[in-house]
Amino acid sequence: LWALEELGLEYELINMEFPPRATYPGYLDLNPLGTVPTFTDGELVMTESSGICHYLEDMYGSRALGVAKDHPAYGEYLNWLYRSDATLTFPQTLVLRYTRLEPEERRIPQVVEDYSIWYHSRLRSVEMALEGKEFLCADKFTMADIAVGYALFLGVSLGLDERYKPNCKRYLANLMERPGFKSARQKQQG
């Protein structure tokens, strides 16, 4: 959603109760995983956030939010773009599951503690990368910043931001001031 706003693309947003597989008729037909997000573009259906960001930039961004393949920071850009889901968001999904989604009797505090620690240990790479920098790579705002910024924002909703270090705090605060971020949040909240 944030990527669509930053690119200025038109789209239809369907807000659903979470988790959508339980409350939205036909959602499992569109996305058998029952996860969010689900992005469609014509006949194409995508369900991986980083892949969606990559696709949007390649198809519609004209490198506005990407890094050219011949740029020295291209590999770094892709690494950050995909690190967001694989490394930063993954442990948060377990924190979310075992603090909010599971019935009280199935919640496992040790899982929450372990994966919170794991998440914070993974943020060391973000903290180091942002030392003396405004953005993660290529000296500009990119889809990688959207992806990693969203992971940091998700941490706020889970109460994990209390242990964010100064660079991560500054970075997230700056990203949250972007008009595209604000517009996406407003539309998401209805």
Provide a role label for each language-model segment:
Residues 1-110:
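GST-like domain detector, emphasizing the conserved glutathione-binding G-site
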Residues 13, 139, 164, 184-185:
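A generic structural-conservation signal
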Residues 181, 185-190:
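Terminal-tail/helix-coil boundary detector
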Residues 57, 151-152, 185:
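Active-site-flanking alpha-helical
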Residues 81-179:
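GST-like fold's C-terminal all-alpha helical module
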Residues 29, 177, 186:
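Phosphate-coordinating loops and pocket residues in cytosolic domains that bind phosphorylated ligands
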